[in-house]
Amino acid sequence: MTESKIAIGTVQFGTNYGVSNKSGVTPVTEVKKIINLAQENNIKYFDTAPVYGESEQVLGKCLNNYGEIITKTISIKNKVISEADIVNIRSEFNRSLKRIKRDSVYALLVHNSNDLTKKGSERLHDELCSLKDEGKIKKIGLSAYTADDIDSVISRYEMDLIQLPVNLFDQRLIHNGYLKSISEKG
């Protein structure tokens, strides 16, 4: 069986999220079933973030070293990124590692694409590169919602991966040719 590129989104493992979510946070017993089903189907990527409630803790409890974690940075509130913001990013990332019970993760995505276009964004990118050099992350990435967001970041910085809002129901970035064009760029 070939490795799947599908990632399981885990926001509902830790918080009551979603327009059609009528049952609240996914119980741990169900999370374990989802992880078992993922293993049976060679799905090994799990997407989480510090802002997803208890999601990271649930993954740390349930994964038992299976799979690859993709997590995200906290958003930077300031208009100009300072050294203090970078210290906060590093500290929160270290807390994420503790919550998921790992020494490293597959990828760290910048959760708010605007953080990579603000004044001082090179500090954030440099910190991501440092984490990669230290072996704490394998991939540097971006979570984005629009083609403009992606373009504004990749014109400044190289990204190993980009998380896009593409699913069975929302395929705008496929149909308008954008996904193909950025794929061709590498």
Which stretches of residues belong to each language-model region?
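N-terminal binding-site loop/beta-alpha segment at the start of enzyme catalytic domains
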Residues: 1-68
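Acidic (Asp/Glu)-rich catalytic clusters
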Residues: 2, 59-69, 97-103, 132, ...
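Structural preference for beta-strand elements that scaffold enzyme active sites
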Residues: 3-7, 44-45, 68-70, 104-109, ...
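Active-site beta-loop-alpha junctions enriched in small/polar residues
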Residues: 11-13, 49-51, 72-76, 110-113, ...
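Short, acidic/polar
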Residues: 22-38, 84-101, 144-153
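Acidic-and-aromatic substrate-binding clefts and catalytic sites of carbohydrate-active enzymes
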Residues: 47-57, 77-83, 115-119, 168-174
